[in-house]
């Protein structure tokens, strides 16, 4: 891992460009409202994690309504929280405690052909290695919100 000050907005722009075709093809609105916060992380792995989360938002969108993915940041004291919210099909309450388990696909994953159950597992492991906190909140049939919290850490400042 290469931990250094990283611009969240530049990583989001890169991820948006990578997913541009899928977002357009599936008529998904991407609403980005982020302050240009710098966080201590590995930019390559942050991009990988955001890509996984956005791919899940695209994969599990609600076909019955206009899909929207909202990305925001909030800085409170010594931490920055990056939130990725979608109005997709959500995650069943019974599946939520297991979504970070290796190979766990849940009820939604069993309905989608390209689900391996590895995406959130890897994202969780990367957050642990990088010292970030990962939270997922969801209401089945309504939304999913994934939050990555970055802490200011003097350990990485040489």
Named regions from a protein language model:
Residues 57-61:
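Short helix-loop "hinge" at the ATP-lid/N-box region of the Bergerat-fold HATPase_c
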Residues 66-78:
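Short beta-strand/loop element within the Bergerat-fold HATPase_c
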Residues 63, 104-114:
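Glycine-rich ATP-lid/hinge loop adjacent to the conserved G-boxes
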Residues 91-103:
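Short conserved segment of the HATPase_c
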Residues 1, 34, 38-42:
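Conserved micro-motifs of the catalytic ATP-binding
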Residues 86:
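Acidic ATP/Mg2+-coordinating residue in the GHKL
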């Amino acid at each position: 891992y290469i931990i250094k000050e990283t611009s969240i907005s530049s990583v989001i722009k890169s991820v948006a460009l990578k997913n541009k075709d899928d977002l357009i093809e599936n008529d998904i609105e991407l609403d980005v409202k982020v302050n240009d916060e710098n966080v201590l992380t590995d930019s390559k792995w942050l991009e990988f994690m955001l890509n996984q989360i956005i791919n899940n938002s695209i994969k599990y969108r609600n076909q019955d309504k206009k899909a929207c993915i909202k990305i925001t940041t909030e800085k409170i004291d010594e931490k920055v929280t990056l939130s990725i919210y979608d109005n997709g099909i959500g995650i069943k309450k019974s599946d939520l405690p297991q979504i970070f388990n290796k190979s766990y696909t849940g009820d939604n994953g069993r309905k989608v052909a390209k689900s391996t159950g590895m995406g959130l597992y890897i994202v969780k492991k990367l957050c642990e290695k990088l010292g970030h906190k990962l939270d997922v909140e969801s209401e089945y049939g309504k939304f999913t919100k994934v939050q990555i919290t970055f802490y200011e850490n003097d350990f990485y400042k040489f």
